[in-house]
Amino acid sequence: MKTIASTALPAHVLQPQYDRQALRSRIVHFGFGAFHRAHQALLTDRVLNAKGGDWGICEISLFSGDTLMSQLRAQDHLFTVLEKGADGNQPIIVGAVHECLNAKLDSLAAIIEKFCEPQVAIVSLTITEKGYCIDPATGKLDTRNERIIHDLEYPDAPHSAPGMLVEALHRRRERGLAPFSVLSCDNIPDNGHVVKNAVLGMAHKRSPELAEWIAANVSFPGTMVDRIVPAATDDSLAEIAREVGVEDPCAISCEPFIQWVIEDNFVAGRPEWEVAGVQMVQDVLPWEQMKLRMLNGSHSFLAYLGYLAGFAHINDCMADSALRDAARRLMLNEQATTLRITGVDLIAYADSLIDRFANPALQHRTWQIAMDGSQKLPQRMLESIRLHLQRDTAWPLLALGVAGWMRYVSGVDDAGNAIDVRDPLSDKIRAIIETSSEEERVAALLALNEIFGHDLPQDPQFVEAITKAYQRISQSGARQAIIDTLSL
């Protein structure tokens, strides 16, 4: 069978210009998903093209991904990233990955031993918020999680990412090997501290002495990641096959824009990511808040309200003047004003986001962005609302965004069509929807302390604003509610 590894590719396809035989598994990565392929793996590939070296990546998947990894092996661990701009496409063959391990294809034991190889300097992760097994109410390890319960009973055969990391560090310590840095690349607030809390929480349960050693010797750099990477579809894979002349089941499409901001705190070295445009900084938090509130907050706003109004893609929302205006006003009037970042032109940043959202080549589905809202709302909207309440400043579009989520999870769009709601709290949410009337809906959903905490549901100003916004959507539909809110 022809693959990208065995076929002469068209001249416009960018290919690795370095010796892939020199690569070693210096980076072990959890989660061979779409975002990692189009972001961290691609940027590491750029460093190798510029500098050469041995910073190869070994991909790890525990309980899924065996088909994808079999396909990756069949094409010498190469895959295609298609950057899709309004002016045309650029296909890139990424060669930084040179090895992969999967629990089903290989074994759990082989995966754990891979972490223990002396050359491993970084363990990176894109496993989504759920993968860290953190209790959202406390920010600490969720000891009720089934995988955590298993790992505490069988620490040498872990099923969770925290369990795997702790067992690997335990073995490295026992063997006198240097520790590695743990690099979360997930789009969650304070991701370095999230993974640190998970690892130290697990280690403390096993051995306080081990936890002390990890705290003293392992670093957990924070990161901010940014690139719009829609999930692969049959159409996107077919388009990539036309571009490169052969099918690539591991391929992914994305926008041309890419940004990675990393806290420069590594205990065992790192690639020279700066040459690929990565920003190495002392404090990631201001960058992270800018992105989560201005980009992700407006993305979620458009996802809920756009989907309700019948818009299938973000670029469809951008073609509507009301939604486009609302997104920009939300960014600048209600989100930018909550930030403490310096040296960044936030008006120019907002304009660049609007241009990126309008990219017709991406076809980023509103339904995809609307997933897992219970885990996204707090950092994307609710943190900003708390600041507005403290300052007594206006936040009508944030209120509409939260109300849009409530209307979306109610399960019916403005045209009366059923919505396939995907959320970690979907069972709880469904029970609330089924047992509350339309008039009771806001109060019933606000009782979800995992999302709203204990403070917001007790704040009369907050409750009134969300209730009015919800009524506006219920009575007039999402698009008209946006128009009415813009005229307030």
Regions found by a protein language model. Give the residues of each.
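Substrate/ligand-engaging "lid" and interaction regions
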Residues: 1-488
